[in-house]
Structure formats: structure tokens, C-alpha cells
Amino acid sequence: MEADVMHAPAAEVGRSRTLLIGSALAAASTLMLFAGLFGVYISIRQNNEYLIENQLDGGMLWFPDLAVQIAPGTMMMFTTWISAFTMAWAVQAIRNDDRRNAYVALGLTILMGAAVINQMVFAITDFGVPIDRSVPSLLLYTLYGAYIAFLAIAIIFVLLMGIRALAGQFDSTNADGIEAAAIIWFTAVIVYLPLWYLITITK
């Protein structure tokens, strides 16, 4: 009996969840950053509306007529939603050891992210107002620039996790890398919704 106990296999060491925890912390930090930027934007805009309504000095036209088009911003929103589904597809595929579909889903996710960046650069170019022309234009460039930077980081992260998946580091027993990439990607999708509403809808 004692011999059986002595030769019993050691308990399996639990996997480190460092990548998932780090990604969750990065996502939380990003949400706080954009919440601060949105707060500044809303505060300055409400103050501007107060000045205009009360005919006080300092009020200004927020954006020139037709400077911000609804179609490009809305198209970007739908593109981010589609990318959320492809990212979720990648996670499910790697959990099922369906590597082919995982690679396809990751590739489509990266493609969607690149499309959003392209659309956003087009929207900025189409805006046609220099960054130093007014406070509203500065805020618009700041919000769009911050989002482009974060989305670019998310694309690189998904690409790196995809390369690791190609190397065989992730499977049904260890999908942490793809799940971590999904956390960052879903954060980018969530952040765009208030950005779309503030810039495209309320203008």
C-alpha cells in the first residue's frame, strides 16, 4: 500500500494564467483611458453648447456642415461587429482543435481591423479641417488617433498569437494566447461604440 502511494503520479501543475490576466489588465486600462478622453470631449462640448445658448463669448461652431459623414463611421461600426464574431470564431475553433478554421478566423479578424484603420484614415482625410484649426478638430484627431493606435496594437497582438498558433503552441488544452487576443480585440470593439456615437451621430 505504501509503495503504491510512493509511486503515485504527481499532481498536475496548474497552468499560469499570466497572459490572460495581463490582457485583462491592459483592457481595463484602455477602457479607463478612453473613458477619460470621452469625458473630456463631452465636458468641452457641453460647455460650448452652454456658451452658445446663452450667447456668451467663446462659443464656436463644433464641426463644419458635412465635415463628419454618417456613412463611413457607421460602416466602421459594422466592420468592428463582424470582427468580433470572427474573433469569437477563432477562439471556439482553437478550443476544438480546428486549426484550419482558427487560422481563417484570425486572418479575417486582422483583415477587418486593417479595413477599419483604412476607413478611419479616410474619414480623417475627408474631414478637411487642420488639427490646429479649433478645439473640436483637436479632440476629433485625438480620439481617432488614439483609437487607431490601440487597434493597430490589437492587430499586432492577434498576429503574434496567430504565429504562435501556427507553431503549435495553442490547442484545446491551452488556448490562453487566442483568448487573450480576444480580450484585447473585444475591448477595441466596445470602445468604438461610444466613439461612433459621439463623433458620427451627435457630431
PLM feature spans:
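...captures the hydrophobic TM-helix bundle architecture rather than a specific catalytic motif
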Residues: 1-203
